[in-house]
Amino acid sequence: MNIENAYDQLNAWINTSNGSYIDIGGERYSFSRLKTITKDELSNFESDNNLKLPNDYKSFLINVGCVNIFVGEKTAGIEIIPPTDIRNFSKSVFYNFGDDLYPRLLLTTSIPKLGYFGGFWMESESKENYGIFYPDIPPELWIEECDFIKFDDWLIKLVKYKSRKI
């Protein structure tokens, strides 16, 4: 599976589900598109905020959008957050936990049932700059404890894993 296949699969699930539960790989999930994003909107956001968003995040937003995916009947799923919400989301995550790492860390993903967050470490020179951060690790240790990967690779693994038949 490549990233285009993952985008196509997610879009198919979103269009089929439209917020209702559908059977995926032996589980029932709902999928919904919260917002579509254009190249112009991303460019304007980058200009207005003097910030360069990661290319794989921009590609996801253009091809799939801001979404709530893999929402189970007992789980909250995974939300990919629009760029306009990243700053406030980051403030809420780091509230009472020390320094807000925005814009060095762009938290773009919320996995609320587990208390996980995903984001891009912007100070990395590598394309492997996306990580999932866990609540049992103090935020001040997130960067040094994280095994960073490419966002596209994370997304492909997620789609493949969730769609496998049990």
Curated annotation (Swiss-Prot):
Taxonomic superkingdom: Bacteria
Gene3D superfamilies listed in its UniProt record: SMI1/KNR4-like
Phenotype of null mutants: A double rhsB-rhsIB deletion is outcompeted by wild-type cells, restoration of rhsIB restores normal growth in competition experiments. Restoration of growth requires the RhsB-specific immunity protein, rhsIA does not restore growth.
SUPFAM superfamilies the record matches: SMI1/KNR4-like (SSF160631)
Function of the molecule: Immunity component of a toxin-immunity protein module, which functions as a cellular contact-dependent growth inhibition (CDI) system. Specifically inhibits its cognate toxin RhsB. Cell contact is necessary for growth inhibition.
UniProt protein name: Immunity protein RhsIB
Provenance organism: Dickeya dadantii (strain 3937) (Erwinia chrysanthemi (strain 3937))
Originating gene: rhsIB
